[in-house]
């Protein structure tokens, strides 16, 4: 029998895929199931890690959304996950999956929004990844809890 993802919804799918998964590492305080993971290390600081995927045609339409605004949004949706866990975002990694229709100038415009968000929230861009794709953009943000 085939179950459509829509029948479970996002959280139902996450619950189904992660059922029975238990952390093996002592440093993993809270894993799957909230806005961000919580990692704890001997320094007594905890690390929050989150990932948000923004996909064209699902989360935004470039007909209506300027790239600079999309860049800003892609950063702050990750920051909000960290704030939701009572943390403060410090770093972000940016991963992009792009089709050939995007130019370098387009990506500079996208990054201008990411940079603006990072400046306003005092967050460092520390790395990321790029890949070819049809339409997808992906952003990941790790952060220490204050």
Predicted feature locations:
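Conserved small/polar residues in nucleotide/adenosyl-binding loops
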Residues: 139-146
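Extreme N-terminal cap/leader segments of soluble proteins
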Residues: 1-66, 85, 94, 117
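Short, glycine/acidic-enriched loop or turn micro-motifs at the edges of active sites
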Residues: 55, 132, 146
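A broad detector of the eukaryotic-type serine/threonine protein kinase catalytic domain
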Residues: 58, 97-98, 145
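A glycine-rich phosphate/pyrophosphate-binding beta-strand-loop-alpha-helix module
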Residues: 65-138
């Amino acid at each position: 029998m085939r179950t459509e993802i829509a029948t479970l919804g996002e959280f139902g799918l996450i619950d189904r895929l992660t059922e029975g998964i238990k952390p093996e590492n002592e440093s993993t305080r809270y894993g799957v199931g909230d806005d961000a993971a919580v990692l704890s290390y001997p320094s007594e600081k905890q690390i929050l890690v989150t990932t948000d995927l923004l996909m064209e045609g699902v989360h935004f339409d470039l007909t209506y959304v300027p790239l600079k605004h999309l860049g800003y949004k892609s950063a702050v949706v990750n920051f909000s996950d960290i704030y939701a866990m009572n943390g403060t975002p410090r770093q972000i990694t940016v991963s992009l999956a792009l089709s050939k229709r995007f130019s370098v100038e387009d990506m500079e415009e996208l990054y201008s929004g990411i940079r603006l968000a990072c400046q306003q929230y005092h967050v460092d861009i520390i790395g990321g990844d790029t890949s070819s794709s049809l339409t997808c953009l992906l952003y990941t943000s790790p952060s220490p809890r204050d």
